[in-house]
């Protein structure tokens, strides 16, 4: 699991006008929380935060404060302004090495399905899995081998255990009946054109 360092500044919980000024300066108000502990109000640079959000992998985020302290965390939520697309807030959860954490991890499909070789098409319906694991076992992604899937076959969350390549310990929290990926038969292009009557 790759660790990303994100520079952060502590802040006092402020009024709406204070938050507006913070955002105008290119910063995003955020909160770092952990069950049973006081939350920490902070801010991070929006440009740096975007690089964390727009990634295809999961990461542990080390929040590095101006006093030199670092807090390992995962980002649990973020909000956008629907009009400007700017990031308006982010929530981080503090990680403890001996405590399990629930995270969403991207699914990486590998292999060329048998059904595709026969002319079928792959349709993925689930792109992330929600799992529970220790921080040391948190994967950047979960690799699923789909090479044995034939035309007309579907794979559900409950059937993934034999397909996952990562040798780590985690519990899948996503509904076991949720469809993940299917190999569909090719669509009929069009009905045959009617034959014109002879003159």
From Swiss-Prot:
Similarity comment: Belongs to the bacterial ribosomal protein bL25 family. CTC subfamily.
Matches recorded under InterPro entries: Rbsml_bL25/Gln-tRNA_synth_N (IPR020056), Ribosomal_bL25/Gln-tRNA_synth (IPR011035), Ribosomal_bL25_b-dom (IPR020057), Ribosomal_bL25_C (IPR037121), Ribosomal_bL25_long (IPR001021), Ribosomal_L25_dom (IPR029751), Ribosomal_uL5_bac-type (IPR020930)
UniProt-listed Gene3D superfamilies: Ribosomal protein L25, beta domain (2.170.120.20), Ribosomal Protein L25, Chain P (2.40.240.10)
Keywords: Ribonucleoprotein, Ribosomal protein, RNA-binding, rRNA-binding
HAMAP family: Ribosomal_bL25_CTC
Subunit structure: Part of the 50S ribosomal subunit; part of the 5S rRNA/L5/L18/L25 subcomplex. Contacts the 5S rRNA. Binds to the 5S rRNA independently of L5 and L18.
Pfam families per UniProt: Ribosomal_L25p, Ribosomal_TL5_C
Protein name, per record: Large ribosomal subunit protein bL25
CDD domains per record: Ribosomal_L25_TL5_CTC
Taxonomy, superkingdom: Bacteria
NCBIfam families the UniProt entry points to: bL25_bact_ctc (TIGR00731), PRK05618.3-2 (NF004136)
SUPFAM superfamilies reported in the protein's UniProt record: Ribosomal protein L25-like
A Gene Ontology BP annotation from the UniProt entry: translation
Known function: This is one of the proteins that binds to the 5S RNA in the ribosome where it forms part of the central protuberance.
Record-level GO cellular component terms: cytosolic large ribosomal subunit
Listed GO MF terms: 5S rRNA binding; structural constituent of ribosome
